Amino acid sequence: MGEQRLARSSFLWGLSGIYLVAFVSLYAQIPGLYGREGILPAWKMMRFTGKGFWEQLKDSPSLLWFGPRLGLDTEMTMEMICLLGALLSLGALLFSFLRDSLVFLLLWIFYLSLYQVGQVFLYFQWDSLLLETGFLAVLVAPVHALRWKTSVWSSHDGVTFWLTRWLLFRLMFASGIVKLTSRCPTWWGLTALTYHYETQCIPNPAAWFAHQLPVWFQKFSVVATYFIEIGVPLLFFLPFRRLRLFSFYSQVVLQILIIMTGNYNFFNLLTVVLCCSLLDDQHITFFQRHKKPQHKGGRVTSAFSLYSLISLLDVPIFGLLVFWTVKYFDLQINWEKHSVESRTAFTYHDFQQWLRTITFPTIWIAAASLGWEILKGMYRSASVRGIFWKLWSTLQWVIFSCAAVAMFTISLVPYTYIDFESNGHLWPEVHRMFNAVDRYQLVNSYGLFRRMTGVGGRPEVIVEGSYDRETWTEIEFMYKPGNISTTPSVIIPHQPRLDWQMWFAALAHNSHSPWFASFVYRLLQGNKDVIHLVQNDESLYPFHAYPPTYIRAQLYKYWFTEVDQSGQMPKSWWRRRHVEEFFPAVFLGDPFLDNLLTQHGLKDKPPARRSLDAPIPSALRLIRAFLHPLPAPLLLHSFIFGIFTIYFLQAMFGGVSKPGVAKQRHSKPPNEKKKQKSNSGQGESAAAKSSGHGADTVRRNKKNEKS
């Protein structure tokens, strides 16, 4: 792969934006989710157990342990961490010098600290993915304090940036594999997308239209998903540039389609950011129309010709990938019906055999790719002139190469979860290494949409309140489906974590969601912070004047409406049918409710509130009072609009380069530049003496150097 300086810079810029979104989105929900009287109070996770301070910090690594030393309770410490994280990530988004390893280390520590007390509301795969990506950014980002005069170039950059490609491979490959290993009949029958759009957590309006597409197209889309998630990732580590670029665009197209048809917070955006690892600088600067230097000499021409011949191998490789897809999914064009017919033409046993065969070869191919990057880094370090610079570059190469090998090694444990037989064949030392760092979320296993839920109707919990236990009023949420006539929400990149957990709660008995009892309890109390999670505008909350006396929850099945045979659009987005009672009617002091709360420790009294008159608590209260009325999606969209406005104005009037485009000066050590200049001068003299057009050649070379 060619140079990836701009690709790396784009990755760091994009990750800064993802961090900003994650911190701001979570900040808006802290009082209702984790406050002293929230649904799952965070202070319960920070109880001192008699161990020493540093021992507790080791067991549960979180900056929240330092909150009491600053005069802050747990909730306010979380708010301060979110605000600091948002401010730091905003700075990294706007200023390239802040995209530093130390800055990304702080961002990772901030999010890990929140994750430790997040409980069920932060246990999503994208939270784990952000933590793993964030830690890799610590290795990928430049350490400006150690580079002195060289602010961009380092011999180990290709080694550490390779880890993001490996993470992207594990994410996409596992996401495709688990769909088949789960034995879900909809994934095996290629009908999953006929249910997906209406059964996803928070559909958007485009999901309704996607649901209306013909069945043959939905089945073909599932085949395309397998092709992109299972087949294409196998191309990530092959030495063929065009295959990598094809991999990049296929992955990005898939993520964009998911973004267009669902509200998946920052997950798909983070995946697109990881896709930067498949790009090189030549492709990023393609539209700048840089002229390529003229190659001189038979040796260069021969090498170029050999490279051209080798690069032709990408055509048969791509052809084989398409052939296997057509064969194993029996793709056939039905000209009469103007459709593409498809079916799964292999068995579960066949797939397991293939998976067992392919798992370790993918590891060895990835290891060979990493080894090649390490060798290239060693060569670059050895090419640096000057004893001091050479030693300094070699030392960095050794340290970061060892770190990359260690990260790759421990990641093999969660990666091989796709085939437990392969997982059992890993060396015991690898498992011990993984267990030693597991608490820090450095590496994780992935596999989204393992099984398609909602076959036979989308289950939805509808909460109802009453004053007399006779007349019940539905409590409508801002984002999740409820009223069948309400237009589905568009809230990306915000994640309303209560709405998401309501979707999971509907999939099982209420006993599988202990937090739901606490949620009902807070609504009976009329807790303003919890109500704010349900409706930002209190006037839309049906019990804003007085809390309800009774609350219950009903389980419904929802389906998207359909266009009738005449082509007329329906008046409602949804149709629904009552299934059963999800949670019985309860009231404050109800023995059933009290028993649930006591059983899960959700009725414990919080510790005494700390003084709010100190400077830091006072400042945090002012910020909260200012931002509290704003809906979280509006707050995030305002940030995004403001950031792009700043970049637009800079591009128009400031002459500032585009985001992610690194400046090229000081890209190599000074001695390396002198060597290049010296060699260039000697080459020009030789060319001028050996050619009748020597003067033209020199002028042409100088022109290329300037461009």
UniProtKB/Swiss-Prot annotation:
Keyword annotations from UniProtKB, A to Z: Endoplasmic reticulum, Glycoprotein, Membrane, Transmembrane, Transmembrane helix
Feature: compositional bias, Basic and acidic residues: 696-707
Membrane topology: Multi-pass membrane protein
Keyword Endoplasmic reticulum applies: yes
Any single biological process term in GO: protein maturation
Membrane spanning stretches: 11-31, 78-98, 102-122, 126-146, 220-240, 256-276, 306-326, 358-378, 398-418, 634-654
Superkingdom to which the source organism belongs: Eukaryota
InterPro entries documented for this protein: LMF
Glycan-linked positions: 483
Cellular localisation: Endoplasmic reticulum membrane
A GO CC annotation given for this chain: endoplasmic reticulum membrane
Region (Disordered): 659-707
Major site of localization recorded for this protein: endoplasmic reticulum
Function in brief: Involved in the maturation of specific proteins in the endoplasmic reticulum.
Entry similarity comment: Belongs to the lipase maturation factor family.
PANTHER family: LIPASE MATURATION FACTOR, LIPASE MATURATION FACTOR 2
UniProt name for this protein: Lipase maturation factor 2
